């Protein structure tokens, strides 16, 4: 957990082991993470926590996405629904969040491991269906700036609308 911060970071390891789709934009290698409330990590293992296990599920789904579909990759243009693509459902039934947008990491800069390999880090941020439309119009970086909690998971934050 970052010192002096009110959040913990859960990050994938191994997503960048193999390249995703060939691209001249340098999108072949990435890792994804989520900034979650500190107390979620203090309660033990996220996998054993029914209320917050979705964090691990969506990180794993995102990590595999760029490898299982031919020509696929992840970057800040990608929105990933929770559940099935045609039938997204909330992470937690008490809230409206049904997808995550990918944002460039503010915490970890891109890592050049050798001449040909540059690993980019992205933060997954939960969004609602209304916010999904905003992301499609304005982009994830603009929407992240509009969120009161930035790129941290905060189910109590104000929901953005198109107005």
Where are these regions (language model features)?
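Acidic, proline/glycine-rich low-complexity IDRs
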Residues: 1-20, 27, 33-163
């Amino acid at each position: 957990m970052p010192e002096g911060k009110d959040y913990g970071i859960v990050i994938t390891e191994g997503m960048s082991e193999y390249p995703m789709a060939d691209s001249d934009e340098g999108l072949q290698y990435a890792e994804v993470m989520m900034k979650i409330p500190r107390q979620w990590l203090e309660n033990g293992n996220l996998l054993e926590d029914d209320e917050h296990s979705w964090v691990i599920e969506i990180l794993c789904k995102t990590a595999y996405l760029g490898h299982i579909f031919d020509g696929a990759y992840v970057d800040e243009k990608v929105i990933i629904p929770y559940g099935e693509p045609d039938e997204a459902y909330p992470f937690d039934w008490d809230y409206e969040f049904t997808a995550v947008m990918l944002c460039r990491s503010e915490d970890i800069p891109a890592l050049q491991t050798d001449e040909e390999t540059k690993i980019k880090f992205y933060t997954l941020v939960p969004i609602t269906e209304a916010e999904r439309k905003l992301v499609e119009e304005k982009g994830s970086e603009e929407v992240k700036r509009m969120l009161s909690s930035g790129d941290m998971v905060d189910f109590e934050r104000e929901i953005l609308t198109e107005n």
